[in-house]
């Protein structure tokens, strides 16, 4: 780990909004490198502090933690609503884009708890290379599962590794007409990447927000084969 000092910059008087274009803030040097080993996670803490004459120091600092992990997410981890489809055999799909080839190992979903667990239904977890035309890479039946704790996602392990590149989609096929009530985040709007199909073709969603499904990449999967013993 290392620390990068961006220095200081004087903001012109009477400036109420806008972006600071000071190069050390705008384009900081990368001086902390990833390990030569296979790291799955890395995080950086970015801190900005504003000082002024007579400033009390209260509320003068903005801190952001930038995480690099093994999953993609449009949501912020907190559901404000639930998403589902009201027609049997309907499908929903979220589009993602990879910058480099990687291996999909698992998919996480958050399901809202409901009265009498009404959404505890079976569904098909799906992965597509394309939805128009449909090119299905994975389809397997699972049951809605709740994970103990506040807003904890359930992780579905894929029984086969899927090597992906460029654009791909993850989603579900709903076997019944009961709403699965997948967590839906209103705070972050990624509606342009969410599509649904109730049997008459794919359409973009009309709802502003993000479906709480996440693809997980790159972890080593157990093979079930014992390690070979060295020859003597």
List the predicted regions and their residue ranges.
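Extended extracellular/luminal ectodomain segments enriched in beta-structured repeat modules
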Residues: 98-108, 120, 165
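Residue-level detector of functionally pivotal "anchor" positions at catalytic/ligand-binding pockets or at interdomain
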Residues: 67-99, 209-232
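A short beta-strand element within beta-rich, extracytoplasmic domains
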Residues: 102-115, 172
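Short, aromatic- and glycine-rich surface loops/edge beta-strands on solvent-exposed regions
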Residues: 32-64, 168-172
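Intrinsically disordered, low-complexity Pro/Gly/Ser/Thr-rich segments with frequent PxxP/GP/PP motifs
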Residues: 2-39
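Short, surface-exposed beta-strand/loop patches at domain edges
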Residues: 173-221
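Coil residues (strongly favoring Ser/Thr
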Residues: 2, 60-61, 103, 160
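Aromatic- and Gly/Pro-enriched, solvent-exposed loop/edge beta-strand patches characteristic
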Residues: 117-192
